[in-house]
Regions:
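Short loop/turn motifs that connect adjacent beta-strands in outer-membrane beta-barrel proteins
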Residues: 10-19, 73-74, 133-137, 197-206, ...
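Outer membrane beta-barrel strand-and-loop segments of large Gram-negative receptors
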Residues: 169, 181-185, 189-191, 237, ...
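Surface-exposed extracellular loop regions of Gram-negative outer-membrane beta-barrel proteins
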Residues: 148, 243-254, 298, 333-378, ...
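Signature of Gram-negative outer-membrane beta-barrel scaffolds
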Residues: 86, 175, 179, 195, ...
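Transmembrane beta-strands of outer-membrane beta-barrel pores
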Residues: 24-30, 83-87, 144-150, 180, ...
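Transmembrane beta-barrel wall of Gram-negative outer-membrane proteins
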Residues: 1-93, 122-123, 325
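Gram-negative outer-membrane beta-barrel transporters
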Residues: 397-401, 418-516
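C-terminal beta-signal and adjacent terminal beta-strands/loops
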Residues: 512-519, 541-594
Length: 594
């Protein structure tokens, strides 16, 4: 459910407009998933093969607020607040083979994972624009954003097959885990805009100013390993409670012991930027934009993780000069061409540069403190054709050269894990994208002053070619880049019928993403591939009158399988590592407007 409202006032003798808007919503949904989890050695030998049933409850809340105030048509102040809260609670039971289980019974066993993820995002934005003179204005603003991520009391329990049923696995196989991630993100900006006279559309201007971003990430985790001293048989998995084994009485009698491990990392990122930019319309057809930006980047990471096995610090200090050029040529009222060239960079994320090892359901993952930022050189050419004001045909060709590309890789260590590496000195990306918005028909409705019967379609598709020579990869001669799907297609068909206060909108949305590399294989591992998926959604809204509306949403109607796979080195056979379906989600809603 959701609620929203707003109001506009006029303040003072100058009738300065003041407005506010508020909205808030709450959703809850439940999921049940059957999934397959496997893993192999580099040769293709399966050492983990488990079937799982996962039950999850997802709760989310959203709140938005906006306040705007205009003064004398010269000054503007606005404040935006956004709060997003998401809570997911899940329990997964997995049966099957795992090399951690006793080999006396073919490494068979049972794993239960209970997990809660509680995340909160709070965004505060204050934006101002001050008209200093008729030609000069000041843009200034600040935002303070907070991310709170909690994983309270995650529990992982492993039971190995035994003669009399099952027994609790010894070692570090019974865990309770608590973690917190706090991110504070402060952004500030101040810039002057001087409008130039071009005697055409009066869009020419010169801009220069400063922006700053200051981010602190603080992560803390506490892990408790419950080491079993005396093993008792559990006859059946159908009716057992771990509280019967892990309780105060058994702890006092040394039935089990508790080992506590603390992990912590801190990542500080400071970016100071100065920029200058000029836009000028030389003729009714030609518009040129030229810019130069200087960024001073300072990143520091301190860590003491993995039970003290990884302890240290590292810094990234970079100075970037980032030029950009954009040209627009208006051939006529319906056709235009754009050319853009720029240099940008990509910084590693906090989780990518901390060597903390996170234990996941499918894979463990660990950051790399020695990562370097990537440099990106971008070029794109775009043609836009507008047959009518509501229709569009657009074609874009693009090229990107990436130096020190950051990619996710698989490391063939004991147990194996996913990490991050500057996988190639340079990588290339090239492709084309097409976008079409077309009205199949637009007809007036008889006996209605305000009526319309409209059928329209939208199509967005792209082909992306990527290649890089990767010395660290198992296949060094050249490979696609991780995460880049060669083919992406989005299609929608929408029917809109309006008659007076009533309206009916029905939309069918089809999305396709082709196979892509999920993780690049190294040290003998082949690449992990993510299978392409085709999804279909249907959304319908019926506005019965100015106060009442009905909404129907049917998501994931095709319910495709999401699969990860990897080929074995010895025979090239494809092994499915993960296989699950998200399920079909159907919801019906009622909206009331006052």
């Amino acid at each position: 459910y959701s609620i929203s409202g707003g109001k506009r006032f006029y303040v003072g003798k100058d009738k300065n407009p003041f407005s506010f808007f508020l909205t808030a919503g709450h959703t809850t949904d439940y999921q049940y998933t059957d999934e397959i989890i496997r893993n192999t050695t580099t040769s293709g030998t399966v050492y983990k093969d488990m079937n799982g049933k996962k039950y999850a409850e997802n709760i989310s809340q959203l709140a938005l607020a906006n306040v705007d105030f205009d003064m004398q048509n010269r000054h503007h102040i606005s404040y935006n607040l956004m709060m997003i809260h998401a809570n997911t609670q899940s329990v997964g039971d997995y049966n099957g083979k795992n090399s951690i289980f006793s080999d006396d019974y073919e490494n068979l066993g049972f794993t239960r994972r209970q997990q809660t993820n509680d995340n909160m995002l709070i965004v505060n934005q204050l934006m101002t624009n001050w008209g200093l003179t008729k030609s000069l204005s000041l843009d200034a603003g600040a935002s303070y954003n907070m991310v709170k991520g909690y994983e309270p009391d995650r529990r992982i329990n492993n039971l190995t097959k035994a003669e009399d049923g099952y027994t609790l696995l010894r070692g570090n196989s019974q865990q309770r885990y608590f973690s917190t991630l706090d991110e504070d993100d402060l952004n500030v900006k101040a810039g002057l805009v001087y409008r130039l006279k071009d005697n055409i559309e009066e869009i020419s201007n010169v801009r220069f100013g400063y922006t700053g971003r200051f981010v602190d990430d603080n992560f803390k985790a506490t892990e408790y390993n419950l080491t079993v001293g005396h093993v008792s048989a559990i006859p059946s998995l159908d009716d057992f409670s771990l509280d019967d084994y892990y309780n105060q009485e058994n702890f006092a009698s040394d039935w089990f012991k508790i080992q506590k491990n603390l992990d912590e990392y801190i990542v500080k990122k400071n970016i100071h930027s100065a920029y200058a930019e000029a836009t000028y319309q030389f003729t009714p057809r030609w518009i040129v934009n030229l810019g130069l930006k200087y960024d001073k980047v300072d990143i520091e990471v301190d860590y003491n993780v993995n039970r003290g096995g990884s302890k240290g610090n590292n810094t990234i200090q970079k100075d970037y000069f980032l030029p950009s050029l954009n040209l627009k040529y208006n051939l006529n009222d319906k056709n235009s061409f754009r050319l853009g060239a720029s240099k940008t960079y990509t910084l590693p994320q906090a989780k990518e540069i901390s060597p903390y090892r996170y234990v996941g359901v499918n894979f463990n993952s660990q950051g790399n403190p020695n990562l370097k930022p990537s440099d990106n050189y971008n070029l794109d050419l775009k043609w836009d054709f507008n047959p009518t004001p509501t229709e569009l045909i657009s074609l874009t060709a693009f090229y990107k050269l990436i130096k020190n590309r950051i990619s996710r890789i698989e490391v063939a260590s004991a147990g194996g894990y996913l990490s991050y590496e500057n996988i190639a000195d340079k990588a290339t990306v090239a492709g084309v994208e097409i976008e079409i918005r077309k009205n199949l028909f637009v007809r007036p409705v008889s006996n209605a002053a305000h009526g319309m019967n409209k059928l329209s379609l939208g199509l967005n598709g792209s082909y992306i070619y990527t290649n890089a020579k990767m010395p660290l990869a198992t296949v060094t001669t050249g490979s696609q880049l991780e995460g880049a799907a060669p083919w992406i297609v989005n299609f929608d068909l929408s029917h809109n019928f309006t008659k007076g206060e009533r309206s009916f909108v029905n939309t069918l949305v089809l999305n396709y993403v082709s196979d892509k590399i999920y993780t690049i294989g190294t040290q003998g591992y082949q690449d992990i591939m993510e299978q392409g998926v085709l999804t279909l959604d249907f959304v319908s809204q019926a506005k019965l009158n100015k106060h009442l509306s009905l909404n129907l949403k049917a998501r994931n109607l095709l319910n495709p399988s999401y699969k990860l796979s990897r080929k074995a080195n010895e025979n090239g056979e494809k092994v499915i590592l993960n296989d699950y379906k998200k399920g079909i989600n159907i919801s019906l809603g009622v909206s009331c407007t006052f």
